């Protein structure tokens, strides 16, 4: 995640802040980043497919912090992956599987302390886990959205639309997408580091990011390596800065690199750069105002009028469900997109990967599976049917008295109170 080495170069403009600074404002939250952080406490359960509410507990604790500070959260979850990111996702998936094998071997050998380290490295954050948080958000009227694809451009889009005033995330990629205010390293006391795009001009001469155009900034991260490119061997962000300051066009940069023996790049790099430029600028996002799929920035007519360019850009911004056919296709005209389907995805009702099946809460799914096994192993079918009609989890096992304080009538009214909370009953989120 992020651009290797970028944040250290921005140290001069990183400000120690308290979230009190954002009182009465709305901040976007990178949902998967919080899920990754939360998974450390329940990695064994997640990898071994056992029920757990620990990742929900983490969210509740953080949301209580924001509520005390009178900050309104807007949680953004990742959707489907992009073709342009396949190499990154494949590498990560392979590494997770390797770590899972090591973890299980260590666990079987009785070395459980070291096994936990590898369990944490093998956790795969899933839409079903996000659904658990979504159900909680619905219960407490907390704004959220599932991005059609990546959360980063979705959060930047919300910022561009004025729906949020900052983004809480650990991902420096957000700056390349155009994030104006990035809040990182948030701790349990509400302290964090703030990086503002307006402060780029205050960076030192050896890293004058404020002097670069947006295209040069994209060239820099492509050379140094990002989620969309493998980068150039031995080129970090500092060396990349020197290169882009000398040559403004990527084609000139690559020509010069080909002439030198010190640097080299893979055959696929040129195409990776082209795809990265499209992905950073025109990714699909969901507009919560119009309830329609759109793009982070408007795609130029020069691109939409070229069949060859349309084929390229679709690999970078994602295919969508076509209106009428209900089939997932490379649709460029927004009028031909089934926006109702994508609205259901954005609300967490449909699975963001297959864009068709119902998205089910992870814990609810595990409970249903357990009840199904009980029904198969014994008991009358009628009694089994009666069982599954009951709540799948006793919410008192999930929500402690401290957590239920979110519904306390004396608490800040920053959140709307649900009818269930007013009546004193809390419906099951699992």
UniProtKB/Swiss-Prot annotation:
Q: Which cofactor does it need?
A: Mg(2+)
Please tell me which top-level EC class this enzyme sits in: hydrolase
- A Pfam match: XPG_N
Q: Which gene encodes it?
A: DIN7
Could you tell me what induces this protein? By UV light, methyl methane-sulfonate (MMS) or hydroxyurea (HU), and during meiosis.
Q: Which SUPFAM superfamilies match?
A: 5' to 3' exonuclease, C-terminal subdomain, PIN domain-like
Q: GO CC terms for this protein?
A: mitochondrion; nucleus
The UniProt annotation puts the region (I-domain) at 114-247
Localized where?
A: Nucleus
Instruction: Kindly state a single biological-process term from the GO annotations of this entry.
Output: DNA repair
Q: How is the cofactor bound?
A: Binds 2 magnesium ions per subunit. They probably participate in the reaction catalyzed by the enzyme. May bind an additional third magnesium ion after substrate binding.
Q: Where is this region: N-domain?
A: 1-96
What does the UniProt keyword field contain?
DNA damage, DNA repair, Endonuclease, Hydrolase, Magnesium, Metal-binding, Nuclease, Nucleus
Annotated source species:
Saccharomyces cerevisiae (strain ATCC 204508 / S288c)
The task this protein performs is described as: 5'->3' double-stranded DNA exonuclease.
Instruction: State whether keyword Isomerase applies.
Output: no
The UniProt record gives the binding positions of Mg(2+) 2 as 171, 173, 227
Which sites bind Mg(2+) 1?
A: 30, 78, 150, 152
Question: In the Enzyme Commission scheme, what number(s) does this protein have?
Answer: 3.1.-.-
What protein name applies here? DNA damage-inducible protein DIN7
One GO MF term on file is: 5'-flap endonuclease activity
Family the entry assigns:
Belongs to the XPG/RAD2 endonuclease family.
Q: Does the keyword Metal-binding apply?
A: yes
């Amino acid at each position: 995640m992020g651009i290797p080495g970028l944040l250290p170069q921005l140290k001069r403009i990183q400000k120690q802040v308290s979230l009190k600074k954002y009182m009465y404002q709305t901040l976007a939250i990178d949902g998967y980043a919080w899920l990754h952080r939360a998974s450390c406490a329940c990695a064994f359960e997640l990898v071994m497919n056992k029920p757990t509410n620990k990742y929900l507990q983490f969210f509740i604790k953080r949301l209580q912090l924001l509520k005390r500070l009178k900050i309104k959260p807007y949680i953004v979850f990742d959707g489907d992956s992009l073709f342009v990111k396949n190499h990154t996702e494949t590498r990560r998936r392979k590494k997770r599987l390797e770590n899972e094998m090591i973890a299980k071997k260590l666990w079987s050998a009785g070395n459980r302390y070291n096994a936990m380290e590898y369990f944490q490295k093998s956790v795969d954050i899933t839409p079903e886990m996000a659904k658990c948080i979504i159900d909680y958000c619905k219960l407490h009227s907390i704004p959220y959205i599932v991005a059609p694809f990546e959360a980063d451009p979705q959060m930047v889009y919300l910022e561009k639309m004025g729906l949020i005033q900052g983004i809480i995330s650990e991902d420096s990629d957000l700056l390349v997408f155009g994030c104006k205010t990035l809040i990182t390293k948030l701790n349990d006391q509400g302290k964090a580091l703030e990086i503002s795009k307006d402060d780029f001009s205050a960076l030192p001469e050896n890293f004058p990011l404020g002097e670069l155009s947006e295209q040069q900034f994209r060239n820099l991260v492509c050379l140094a390596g990002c989620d969309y490119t493998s980068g150039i061997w031995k080129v970090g962000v500092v060396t990349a800065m020197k290169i882009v300051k000398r040559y403004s066009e990527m084609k000139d940069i690559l020509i010069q690199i080909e002439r030198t023996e010190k640097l080299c790049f893979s055959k696929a790099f040129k195409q990776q750069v082209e795809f990265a430029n499209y992905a950073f600028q025109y990714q699909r996002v969901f507009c919560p105002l119009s309830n329609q799929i759109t793009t982070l920035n408007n795609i130029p007519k020069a691109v939409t009028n070229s069949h060859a360019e349309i084929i390229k850009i679709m690999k970078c911004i994602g295919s969508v469900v076509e209106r009428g056919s209900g089939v997932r296709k490379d649709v460029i005209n927004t009028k031909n997109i089934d926006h109702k389907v994508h609205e259901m995805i954005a609300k967490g009702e449909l699975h963001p990967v297959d864009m068709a099946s119902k998205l089910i809460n992870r814990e609810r799914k595990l409970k249903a599976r357990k009840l199904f096994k009980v029904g198969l192993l014994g008991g009358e079918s009628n009694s089994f049917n009666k069982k599954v009609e009951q709540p799948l989890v006793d919410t008192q096992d999930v929500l402690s008295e401290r957590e239920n304080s979110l519904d306390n009538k004396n608490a800040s009214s920053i959140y709307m109170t649900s009818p269930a909370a007013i009546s004193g009953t809390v419906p099951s989120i699992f």
